[in-house]
């Protein structure tokens, strides 16, 4: 079974957690090691269109995923980001939360991560994507934490 993420079909091999209403997947072009996404299962374009139970599940799942990626990738902090609508930088028309484990000094300016996320979401060159094998291996390593 594949997962819908906006205009994309996501292979189960890159999904490391599925809850009743959400799923988490590795990123094909991470801004930092461990940069993952958490999405509602239902393809909803804007945050205000989520039902209350979907909001609760999305953020409970995001919290669980954040704890795992911070530990697995030896982070000391987390950045959570959501672009809600085109003027906010949303390029995939499906609500999603970026979860990024952080370390001291990972960016010259701490807030540069937001500039990198903006560039990340606009640059869509398959040549810069990770291989399916690399993504599947990372998803498998993260999946262990949720079994």
From Swiss-Prot:
Changing residue 96 to G: Total loss of catalytic activity. Rescuable with free imidazole. One of its GO terms (molecular function) is nucleotide binding. Disulfide bonds: none annotated. Changing residue 96 to D: Loss of catalytic activity. GO terms for biological process: diadenosine triphosphate catabolic process; intrinsic apoptotic signaling pathway by p53 class mediator; negative regulation of proteasomal ubiquitin-dependent protein catabolic process; purine nucleotide metabolic process. Keywords: Apoptosis, Chromosomal rearrangement, Cytoplasm, Hydrolase, Manganese, Mitochondrion, Nucleotide-binding, Nucleus, Phosphoprotein, Transcription, Transcription regulation, Transferase, Tumor suppressor. Substrate binds at residues 8, 27, 83, 89-92, 98. Residues 2-109 form the HIT domain. SUPFAM superfamilies: HIT-like. A motif (Histidine triad motif) lies at residues 94-98. It is linked to A chromosomal aberration involving FHIT has been found in a lymphoblastoid cell line established from a family with renal cell carcinoma and thyroid carcinoma. Translocation t(3;8)(p14.2;q24.1) with RNF139. Although the 3p14.2 breakpoint has been shown to interrupt FHIT in its 5-prime non-coding region, it is unlikely that FHIT is causally related to renal or other malignancies. Associated with digestive tract cancers. Numerous tumor types are found to have aberrant forms of FHIT protein due to deletions in a coding region of chromosome 3p14.2 including the fragile site locus FRA3B. This is Bis(5'-adenosyl)-triphosphatase.
């Amino acid at each position: 079974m594949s997962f819908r993420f906006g205009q994309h079909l996501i292979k189960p091999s890159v999904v490391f957690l599925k809850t009743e209403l959400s799923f988490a997947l590795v990123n094909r072009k991470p801004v930092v090691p461990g940069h993952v996404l958490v999405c509602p299962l239902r393809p909803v374009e804007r945050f205000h269109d989520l039902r209350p139970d979907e909001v609760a599940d999305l953020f409970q799942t995001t919290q669980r995923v954040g704890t795992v990626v911070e530990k697995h990738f030896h982070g000391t902090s987390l950045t959570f980001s959501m672009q809600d609508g085109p003027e906010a930088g949303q390029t995939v028309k499906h609500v999603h939360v970026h979860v990024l484990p952080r370390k001291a000094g990972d960016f010259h300016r701490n807030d540069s991560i937001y500039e990198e996320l903006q560039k990340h979401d606009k640059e869509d060159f398959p040549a810069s994507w990770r291989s399916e094998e690399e993504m599947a291996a990372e998803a498998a390593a993260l999946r262990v934490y949720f079994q």
